[in-house]
Amino acid sequence: SIPCGESCVWIPCTITALAGCKCKSKVCYN
């Protein structure tokens, strides 16, 4: 998995989610 540079502790992945990133361990991964 590659970190997308966005956290998802309080809110879900937003901008990076459009690039296919999903929340994993409080960080958005691709």
Curated annotation (Swiss-Prot):
Paired cysteines (S-S): C4-C21, C8-C23, C13-C28
Any Gene Ontology biological process: defense response
Keywords: Disulfide bond, Knottin, Plant defense
Transmembrane segments: none
InterPro entries found in the cross-reference section: Cyclotide, Cyclotide_bracelet_CS, Cyclotide_sf
Cyclopeptide (Ser-Asn), cross-linked positions: S1-N30
Free-text description of this protein's post-translational modifications in UniProt: This is a cyclic peptide.
Family named by the database record: Belongs to the cyclotide family. Bracelet subfamily.
Domain comment as written in the entry: The presence of a 'disulfide through disulfide knot' structurally defines this protein as a knottin.
Function: Probably participates in a plant defense mechanism.
Protein name per its UniProtKB record: Cycloviolacin-O7
